[in-house]
Structure formats: structure tokens, C-alpha cells
């Protein structure tokens, strides 16, 4: 089997059902489609059962969180590549039909981590066609720079990726002390560190911005992740700092990607940190009337004024001290995990919170 198309679905809407029906039509000798519904909606379940066919598996699951749904569906995939789809987005028929042939051509080339193409993005009043520059390059520094040069929603998270790589990165991210909405950015970073993305000259995926288009509603979605992890809304102020720190720390210190020279690792880490730190400085983040707003603003001002003067350990200490104001247990878990990463020790996750959501894009 060359390609596994995976849909974990919770929405009971007709739109979601129509997207799933379309995906089921792609099933064939080289493409398996696996749908796992955890909505608990009886009418939807009855409809989905009619979509089952050869190489198309419909799984009716009990209501559960999105992370569990994704974990369970991934266990069933047999394709060399996996293509993860959201049930409210849209894949293009001709692109999907082209994927098995492309996988046949590139499958033995271990320098290829995944497949990219053109992406359609729907806004409230306009549409756009976008692509990522240079992520098909053999040069890892150019790949990461190309990813960072794109300023729109992270549609690369919906790209066909080698199943082995997908599972490896998924397993690692599930060891993180908390899952936040920016972790889709870091997942893509880890993909790019592992290899290039072969380019398909077709529209591959349509992403509807929906609530992510308006800054305040987008940040409310971010806040859902933080609340699920047990955080006060004030942590939202540090959103892009956390992304900057975690991504750069991983580039410098972990070994779940091929051998990359230390000089290149340092360049990529610096590039990642500086790019995300610019977002931290330039993107106004809400605290939603948190009683810790003052402390969050003081820390942001301190860190923004200390550019280039703090080590990773210094930044970790500052973050952990702030998180301790919100929860000492969570602060200790965060510090212990990232201190292990920085010290090149194997981190041990402490289950202080059960993540209920999985990152799915965002601006």
C-alpha cells in the first residue's frame, strides 16, 4: 500500500460528511482510506457506514479527545506515506490520484520526507493559492528558511509524509509536557530536518481559515489548548516565545533526524529563534482578563529587551518561573523536560495534564 489517507472526525455537520464521502471515493488498490468517527452522533454514524468499501475502513469509536482519535487511527495505517486530512477541509481529486504514481517514483529516495504542492486558502472575502519556497531543496538550511518565509496559516501540517517519519515525530511530540497550538509549527520543523518535500505541481489541499482569520478568535482557539493543559490565560502572552525556544532547543539537541553538522544546526536554531522571536515582539497577544496580566507583560518587556543576552537555560528559567506563578507542578514538569533536552538527556514526561486537543493549523 502506497498511501494511507487518515481522517479523525468529530463534527456531525453535512459539510464534514461530504468531505468524508469525497475522501472515501479515493480508495483503491494503492490508496487506503481510514475514517475514525468519535462524534457519538447516531445519524452521522448511520451515514458513514454506507461509505465503507474496499480499501476504505469506517471506524465508529466512542467519544474521546482528538489526540486519542489520531493515535488510534495512526495505528491502523499501512501505507508508505500518510496524508492526514481534517474533516472540514478539502483535498483535490486530481492531486490525490497523482500521489500513488509520485510515491512510486520517490519511494526509494530516503532524502524525501514528504510531498508538497499548491494550497488553496479560503478567507472570508477572498481566496489565495500559496506554496512553500525551497522545501524541496537538498539543503536543510534552505528548507527551514523557506518554511519560515511563508507568513500564512501552516497548511504544511496537511502534507503527505512518510509513515515512519510521521509516527516517529508523533511519538516524540506526545512526550512533550504540554501540547499547544504552535506545536504544528515544530512538527513541520522536525519533518524538514529529516528531509526534503518533493513538489507536486497541482492544487493539493484547501484550507478554510474560519475562526483563525480574526486575531482575537484565533487566540481564543489557542487559549483552548492552554486551558486543556491547565494554564491560566496569561501564558498566551508567551505563545511565540515558547515556539521560538522549544524549536531552537530541539534543533540543537535532539537526535530524531539524520546527522546534521553542528554548524548547520546552530544556523537553523538561530534562524528559527530569530524568526519566532520577531513574532513574539511584533504580535500582540491577549491575556483575556487574567489576574497575571501584569506579570506577563513585565516578563515580555524584560525578554524583548534582552535579545541576544540570554542563553537557552536563562530563557528556560524565565519561562519556568513565570509558569510557577500559574502552577508550580506544571512549571516543574516544563523545566525538567526542557532541561533534559538542553542537557542532551532523555526527557521523561510527567503526566500533570491530559492533553485534550491536537494542533491543527492556525496563523
Which residues fall in each region the model found?
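Short, well-formed alpha-helical segments that are part of the catalytic scaffolds
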Residues: 11-25
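Acidic donor-binding segment of Leloir-type glycosyltransferases
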Residues: 21-60
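Glycine-rich, basic loop-to-helix element that forms the pyrophosphate-binding segment
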Residues: 61-77
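Short aromatic/hydrophobic "clamp" motif used to bind/position activated sugar donors
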Residues: 82
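Conserved donor NDP-sugar-binding/catalytic core segment of glycosyltransferases
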Residues: 96-130
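Active-site donor/metal-binding and catalytic loop motifs
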Residues: 120-127, 194, 200-232
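A short, conserved alpha-helix in the catalytic core of glycosyltransferases
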Residues: 165, 169, 177-201
